[in-house]
Swiss-Prot record:
GO cellular component: extracellular region
A GO MF label: toxin activity
Family under the similarity heading: Belongs to the neurotoxin 19 (CSTX) family. 04 (U1-Lctx) subfamily.
Official protein name in the record: U1-lycotoxin-Ls1f
Domain of life: Eukaryota
Subcellular location: Secreted
Disulfide bond annotation, renumbered to this chain: 44-59, 51-68, 58-86, 70-84
Organism: Lycosa singoriensis (Wolf spider)
Record comment regarding domains: The presence of a 'disulfide through disulfide knot' structurally defines this protein as a knottin.
Residues of the signal peptide: 1-20
Keywords annotated in UniProt: Disulfide bond, Knottin, Secreted, Signal, Toxin
Length: 107
């Protein structure tokens, strides 16, 4: 009976040690992932800034990610160029307005 208790205690110790190592590895992976997300967040393009060269790099707003909105600009020479900026599309503005009113009325 004593041998069984010793073996069970040994198994419990080994399992807890191996699971704690796994948890440490998982925490390290999560930390690296969070650091990568923070780096990506720092590299995103803020609202009203130019996104002509990186049309998918706009930052997130309060509720939605900003969209790269482009227009054609004609220079004084008559040359047409495309200029883009990060902004909130009209349907996202409407949704944010509705959510804002909902928060005011319902707390």
């Amino acid at each position: 009976m004593m041998k069984v208790l010793v073996v069970v205690a040994l198994l419990v110790t080994l399992i807890s040690y191996s699971s704690s190592e796994g948890i440490d590895d998982l925490e390290a992976d999560e930390l690296l992932s969070l650091m990568a997300n923070e780096q990506t967040r720092k590299e995103c393009i803020p609202k009203h800034h130019e996104c002509t060269s990186n049309k998918h790099g706009c930052c997130r707003g309060n509720f939605f990610k900003y969209k790269c909105q482009c227009t054609t600009v004609v220079t004084q020479d008559g040359e047409q160029t495309e200029r883009c900026f990060c902004g909130t599309p009209p349907h996202h503005k409407a949704a944010e307005l509705v959510v804002g009113f909902g928060k005011k009325f319902f707390g």
